[in-house]
Amino acid sequence: MRFNHFSIVDKNFDEQLAELDQLGFRWSVFWDEKKILKDFLIQSPTDMTVLQANTELDVIEFLKSSIELDWEIFWNITLQLLDFVPNFDFEIGKATEFAKKLNLPQRDVEMTTETIISAFYYLLCSRRKSGMILVEHWVSEGLLPLDNHYHFFNDKSLATFDSSLLEREVVWVESPVDTEQKGKNDLIKIQIIRPKSTEKLPVVITASPYHLGINEKANDLALHEMNVDLEKKDSHKIHVQGKLPQKRPSETKELPIVDKAPYRFTHGWTYSLNDYFLTRGFASIYVAGVGTRGSNGFQTSGDYQQIYSMTAVIDWLNGRTRAYTSRKKTHEIKATWANGKVAMTGKSYLGTMAYGAATTGVDGLEVILAEAGISSWYNYYRENGLVRSPGGFPGEDLDVLAALTYSRNLDGADYLKGNDEYEKRLAEMTTALDRKSGDYNQFWHDRNYLINSDQVRADVLIVHGLQDWNVTPEQAYNFWQALPEGHAKHAFLHRGAHIYMNSWQSIDFSETINAYFSAKLLDRDLNLNLPPVILQENSKEQVWSAVSKFGGDDQLKLPLGKTAVSFAQFDNHYDDESFKKYSKDFNVFKKDLFENKANEAVIDLELPSELTINGPIELEIRLKLNDSKGLLSAQILDFGPKKRLEDKARVKDFKVLDRGRNFMLDDLVELPLVESPYQLVTKGFTNLQNKDLLTVSDLKADEWFTLKFELQPTIYHLEKADKLRVILYSTDFEHTVRDNRKVTYEIDLSQSKLIIPIESVKK
């Protein structure tokens, strides 16, 4: 077990004394060390009679004895406060060594009154075995009263807002869009959860088109057939133009203003990180946007009309637009309780909305926490001129997602009045997204947030899994690279798949975000010394490192051929039995592919030295095929048996994370380190007619040509003599159309190479 503390803010001694005093630890520098220890235990919500001090004495006996307090006894006692069991988790008498292995904050200094006070200060900032830092655990146990006012320790807001007194309101915000072209602004239903307090509250918004319901039956009926041939395309240039939808002015009709919303709600999905912030004085707002249950409009899926329906909430919180107590618009309601400062959170589609909102530059949005978000929808459903399904969802496309999230149809009255128009607009979307060619076009350009990255004013916090093949790492990498130089940005890059990371044992993620949000949303100084990239190492359990950048400056070129003349070939076609088997379950195909049992060319490369891949590997391939259309797929494995992190978190302890005071208890989880035969490092796909994003070229059969394309970016450490397995093939049964024509591909390995971006990791 190893803790990684990124939330701890260094404080001078006077600041430490003042903050300890506010918690009730009022000590004099003239007290001796044992008296400070005794008072610390008396004031804390813990039973010191159960604590062991050394191999012979419990704490009560030790405090009565003449034995001096030293660092070994200090750690014997305090490790128990951090939930570690003496004689089982650690050996009494070797506690200092154990604390060092845990990576707990400690200094090798002489014990004095001042150094022990500092030690207790940083102990309160330290992570417990069960996943909370000590001060937050003790506050949840009653160290401070629930007075519905802000209290801070080490620059983090504490859970002193009463979760039993939460206001739950529903209002309808007027958006600046008319997605159905009815001549009136779409109204957007939002759900507000806020502490009852006289304080002006900041808001954490989660914009989730899933939030008010999904239509799974409509989704399943809309899925596209994958067992189709690849289309041949005529050569041409693609032209797009940057344009944003026109914003409609707010209505000006005067209405009576009320200060209480009549509509309430009792239950619904909430993000546990938002729950954590609720009890620390941050209101939560959930908004699903246009085309969702209780709102107006069509589900435009990813364009700026949808984004504007989300940012309208920020406008309302800052008095720039109106909200109503019902869809009838008879009474207006104002956010008099809000301070106007907003953060956005959420994973996947939710993180996507945060990216999009940030690129509007909306005033009041101070910071986004975009977790596994999409920065360009083309790169989610397409790749290099190729229809490419997100991992795990073959046949899905943006019109399918629209059918899933157009939840207005779940209400019968809305279905009666709006389904015909919805069906018409959905058909228009299906045509516009152009599955036939797979090319970039104006439809996708309108859903590309990267082109407006220069408008971002909010601080950007990115979370992304480097084993996420649903929303691939390029979505985070491209947004990171697109931000103007010097923009405030940080990335948490973990080894998981498409998962949240706010309840992991190894890292104080929630507390780090607390320090950041407390500064940005409550007008406090941001003293957090956060590195640009916080990286989970790929070959060690519970180890996180600080990295200076996402994308290396140097390159390593590895030739694919081992001799001057070296060729490989593979066929595209499968027999009927294999084709049906792989089409039925793409996981069977993946297993065979990784074990060299599919139609593929396999090249094993032993590394000449230790290296860290940092960024997208570029594949330069010399090839020919006996057809005038084709696709190329590539995957690279870290191949060979060794211990690696799994991509899904396992529960280490159930319901031990208290998000407030006995509020929304959460499981403690972690990625386990397990023996495995290989691990996927990166992959990529391309249509051979698309040499670049905006150019479609003719492909001549039986003629050699050179192709370059980038694979998914990663940061991945490899030791000398580790083996990279490069797999080249055509049809991928998880991602691409299942083209089963009889085509043979030939690769000139002697003229092909990997171009690997490398960057050493800062330790």
UniProtKB/Swiss-Prot annotation:
It catalyses: Hydrolyzes Xaa-Pro-|- bonds to release unblocked, N-terminal dipeptides from substrates including Ala-Pro-|-p-nitroanilide and (sequentially) Tyr-Pro-|-Phe-Pro-|-Gly-Pro-|-Ile. GO terms for cellular component: cytoplasm. Its main location: cytoplasm. Gene3D superfamilies: 1.10.246.70, alpha/beta hydrolase (3.40.50.1820), Galactose-binding domain-like (2.60.120.260). Its EC number is 3.4.14.11. The keyword Oxidoreductase does not apply. SMART domains: PepX_C (SM00939), PepX_N (SM00940). The active site is at 348 (charge relay system), 468 (charge relay system), 498 (charge relay system). Keywords: Aminopeptidase, Cytoplasm, Hydrolase, Protease, Serine protease. The keyword Protease applies. One of its GO terms (molecular function) is serine-type peptidase activity. It is found in: Cytoplasm. It comes from the Bacteria. One of its GO terms (biological process) is proteolysis. Belongs to the peptidase S15 family. Removes N-terminal dipeptides sequentially from polypeptides having unsubstituted N-termini provided that the penultimate residue is proline. Homodimer. This is Xaa-Pro dipeptidyl-peptidase. It comes from Lactococcus lactis subsp. lactis (strain IL1403) (Streptococcus lactis). The gene is pepX.
